[in-house]
Amino acid sequence: MSQSKDLQGGKAFGLLKAQQEERLDGINKHFLDDPKYSSDEDLQSKLEAFKTKYMEFDLNGNGDIDIMSLKRMLEKLGVPKTHLELKKLIREVSSGSEETFSYSDFLRMMLGKRSAILRMILMYEEKNKEHQKPTGPPAKKAISELP
C-alpha cells in the first residue's frame, strides 16, 4: 500500500491536518487582505472560528465538504435534512461543483448576505455545547420543588 493512500491515524493524520490548516490559513489571509471584507468587525477571530469548524467536518482533508459530511454535521446539530435539501443547500453555496463546496465558498457564504443558514448551524452547535450534563450526584430537592 502506498504511503499517500495510508490515512491511518497518528502521525500521518496529524501531518494531513497540519497541511490542511496551512492551506486554510492562506485562504484566510486572502480574505483578510480583501477590501470587500475589511469592514467586518473582528474578522480575524471569525475566520479562525470558521477554519476550525470547516476542519472538523472536512475529515479526509481534500479541501471540500461533500454531501455526507454536511449530512453528518447537520445530524450532529440535531437538524437532519433530506438528501434533496442537502443538494439544494450545496448548490446555493458552491461556486463550481454541485456535490461539494470549498473553504472559499464556505467563507463567502458565512461573511456574505446569504449566511443565515450556516450562522444558524453554528448557533445551534454553540447552544448544544452549553447544555452539557452536570457531573456528580444530583442536588437535593425539597418536597415543595417536586411536581
From Swiss-Prot:
Membrane topology, from the record: Peripheral membrane protein
Claim: Acetylation is one of the keywords in the record: yes
Domain EF-hand span(s) in chain numbering: 45-80, 81-115
Residues engaged in binding Ca(2+) 2: 98, 100, 105
Species this chain originates from: Rattus norvegicus (Rat)
Protein name: Allograft inflammatory factor 1
GO MF entries: actin filament binding; calcium ion binding
PROSITE patterns xrefs: EF_HAND_2
Keywords of this entry: Acetylation, Actin-binding, Calcium, Cell membrane, Cell projection, Cytoplasm, Cytoskeleton, Membrane, Metal-binding, Phosphoprotein, Repeat
Residue positions, PTM N-acetylserine: 2
Subunit record text: Homodimer (Potential). Monomer. Interacts with LCP1.
Annotated residues for binding of Ca(2+) 1: 58, 60, 62, 64
InterPro entries, per the entry: AIF-1_EF_pair, AIF1/AIF1L, EF-hand-dom_pair, EF_hand_dom
Subcellular location, record wording: Cytoplasm, Cytoskeleton; Cell projection, Ruffle membrane; Cell projection, Phagocytic cup
Physiological role: Actin-binding protein that enhances membrane ruffling and RAC activation. Enhances the actin-bundling activity of LCP1. Binds calcium. Plays a role in RAC signaling and in phagocytosis. May play an role in macrophage activation and function. Promotes the proliferation of vascular smooth muscle cells and of T-lymphocytes. Enhances lymphocyte migration. Plays a role in vascular inflammation.
Tissues of expression: Cardiac allograft, spleen and testis. Expressed by inflammatory cells (macrophages and neutrophils).
GO cellular component assignments: actin filament; cell projection; cytoplasm; cytosol; glial cell projection; lamellipodium; nucleus; perikaryon
Sites of Phosphoserine modification: 39
One GO biological process term: positive regulation of T cell proliferation
Lineage: Eukaryota, Metazoa, Chordata, Craniata, Vertebrata
Organism superkingdom: Eukaryota
UniProt modified residues of type N6-acetyllysine: 11
Induction, as annotated: By interferon gamma.
Positions of region (Disordered): 127-147
Pfam families: AIF-1
